[in-house]
Amino acid sequence: MPMLNAQQFLNQFSLEAPLDESLYPIIRDICQEVKVHGDKALKMYNLTFDHTKTDHLEISHEQIKAAFDTLDEKTKQALQQSYERIKAYQESIKQTNQQLEESVECYEIYHPLESVGIYVPGGKASYPSTVLMTATLAQVAGVENIVVVTPPQPNGVSQEVLAACYITQVNQVFQVGGAQSIAALTYGTETIPKVDKIVGPGNQFVAYAKKYLFGQVGIDQIAGPTEIALIIDDTADLDAIVYDVFAQAEHDELARTYVIGEDAQVLKDLESRIAKALPNVDRYDIVSKSIANQHYLIHASNFDEACHVMNTIAPEHASIQTVNPQPYIEKVKYVGALFIGHYSPEVIGDYVAGPSHVLPTNRTARFTNGLSVNDFLTRNTVIHLSKDTFEQIADSAQHIAHVEALYNHQQSILIRQS
């Protein structure tokens, strides 16, 4: 990829729609089939799409516990440390009900959702971290029923995924994936309970099903390909940056990587190191396609221009690896998560840092946020007025109702004034 100056990049920068519209009829048919035929449809789709025969959709509590008990100690400790850090961070940011003075007449109270479905991807890799980064949040929120769905595998669901479900006290785990699992969580089947909200990343079928069913069920987001944008200078460890780029690229051929810098020579040096390391990289087929088609080097003329490019991209992950990263914290506004300094690589945020790795993609960071414990709470506004307060504001209320020609609204006020 040739180096672009900031203006050249901004002139050509665009993101394709994250979803393939041609999938719509397929998604609609899958959802309808699950709505009508329930578990029978799910087993059929497991065979058709995942080439796995599943006599029992639910994985028993005994199997989940056995997965944890038999897990090697190092993996168990790593998952446990991740869980503890996520739990501590989410507890620190959880919205709580405040003890209020009697004179407070308008306030908010929070309640946990009753039931949540979590989609845990399968296929190209196993993702116990997704369980930790979603189910822990629901647990901290106080969600009563946490349900995980994950695609069936010929050799069974990943033991690491099941162990993470045990650690986070997930209530039920079902081996079903794709759009059909989202439909099952939305409508309910003979085996899978209907939930109030569905969270977790997935492929285009999962994303489109969430979009299609939103309104009948709550969702976290419609995720596109993963992405990272880095701002670097001559103090950055370029060999480390190479693997920050590769780490993102290995997720998906469509993963997008951007490197921004004010020093053109640093960017050229980085690109030569990427080219040198690429032939021997793990997961070469995926990484090489991502680098060939979705990798950008952007030369910014100054600090403000670098920040402007970053805010325009509005990436899922932003990494600042410069001699003085502090000023970027205020200036870089629209990102899913902001990783500051050499010892805060994006990858540590994928696993153990604390905040959830479920983050907005495809420029949606310009108007939405990463998943947090507060996404598993409802917020109710309470209005409890005294007679004195009512009398102070009633005339304004009834007059606005009159202006809007909503006379029953007006009468609701007037009858209380008489």
From Swiss-Prot:
Record EC number: 1.1.1.23
Cofactor(s) demanded: Zn(2+)
GO terms of biological process kind: L-histidine biosynthetic process
CDD domains in alphabetical order: Histidinol_dh
Annotated binding of Zn(2+), by residue: Q248, H251, D350, H409
Binding locations of substrate: T226, Q248, H251, H317, D350, E404, H409
SS bond list: none
A molecular function (GO) term: NAD binding
Pathway: Amino-acid biosynthesis; L-histidine biosynthesis; L-histidine from 5-phospho-alpha-D-ribose 1-diphosphate: step 9/9
Cellular component GO terms, alphabetical: cytosol
Domain of life according to the entry: Bacteria
Binding site for NAD(+): Y119, Q180, N203
Catalytic activity entry: L-histidinol + 2 NAD(+) + H2O = L-histidine + 2 NADH + 3 H(+)
InterPro entries: Ald_DH/histidinol_DH, Histidinol_DH_CS, Histidinol_DH_monofunct, Hstdl_DH
Positions annotated as active site in the UniProt record: E316, H317
Cofactor binding remark: Binds 1 zinc ion per subunit.
Pfam families, per the entry: Histidinol_dh
Stored Gene3D superfamilies: 1.20.5.1300, Nitrogenase molybdenum iron protein domain (3.40.50.1980)
Signal peptide location: none
Keyword terms, alphabetized: Amino-acid biosynthesis, Histidine biosynthesis, Metal-binding, NAD, Oxidoreductase, Zinc
NCBIfam families membership: hisD, PRK13770.1
Sequence similarity: Belongs to the histidinol dehydrogenase family.
PANTHER family found in the cross-reference section: HISTIDINE BIOSYNTHESIS TRIFUNCTIONAL PROTEIN, HISTIDINOL DEHYDROGENASE HDH
Physiological role: Catalyzes the sequential NAD-dependent oxidations of L-histidinol to L-histidinaldehyde and then to L-histidine.
Protein name according to UniProt: Histidinol dehydrogenase
UniProt organism field: Staphylococcus aureus (strain MSSA476)
Native organism taxonomy: Bacteria, Bacillati, Bacillota, Bacilli, Bacillales
Gene, per the UniProt record: hisD
